[in-house]
A protein has these predicted regions:
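Long, contiguous binding/interaction regions
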Residues: 2-77, 81-195
Length: 195
């Protein structure tokens, strides 16, 4: 089993203040950039499918999508991660605002924001691998949440870059199963998404 010592200090992966610097947000392919769009919408049947249908009909790609009720049970908050130029994201925002169920749309990447994603990963952990997998979990501030004689299941949270770095650091042959939630984001400071 070989491990790539990608980063022994997780602060090198996740900025200390949880911000994603502007120069690390860009994919820089013809001005394409990763955007996190936060949508407040009515919590009713069919609302999610109409938003996804809008993206599909116009050929926009959704990298990740999370949705859950808010503190107001009549509203849900949807977080969409998509890649596109500023013009494309502006068009997406305009189209989203036209949907009757949509209450408010904000591109979080226009200001300071905090982003988190959850990953559960089941790894083969036998013999000498067990201690190495535990060490890797500790380095990335993960938690071992399930243990068997042959496996560890590790919970990791952070931005997408941190989770990707963990996947690169462990031996691919040791990865048995992975599930990720997709990004959730919230504006920093006084920025609040409310009606």
């Amino acid at each position: 089993m070989s491990f790539t010592p990608l980063a022994l200090n997780p602060d090198a992966i996740v900025p200390q203040n949880d911000r994603i610097p502007a120069n690390r947000r860009s994919y820089d392919e013809k001005n394409s950039m990763r955007h996190i769009i936060s949508v407040l919408l009515e919590n009713e049947p069919g609302a999610l499918s109409r938003v996804v249908g809008l993206f599909s009909a116009r050929g926009y790609n959704i990298e990740t999508l999370t949705v859950a009720p808010t503190e107001d049970p009549s509203l849900s908050r949807m977080t969409i991660v998509s890649v596109g130029s500023d013009d494309v994201i502006e068009q997406i925002t305009k189209h989203l605002n036209r949907l009757i169920e949509v209450v408010k749309v904000v591109d979080l990447t226009e200001g300071d924001f905090t982003e988190r994603e959850l990953m559960l990963i089941k790894l083969r952990a036998v013999g000498k691998e067990r201690e190495e997998m535990k060490r890797m979990a500790d380095i990335f501030r993960g938690r071992i949440i399930d243990v068997t004689e042959r496996t560890y299941t590790i919970e990791l949270t952070g931005n997408a870059g941190k989770l990707d770095a963990f996947l690169q650091a462990v031996d691919r042959a040791a990865i048995l199963e992975t599930v990720r939630t997709g990004s959730s984001g919230i504006g920093r400071g006084e920025r609040i998404l409310r009606v």
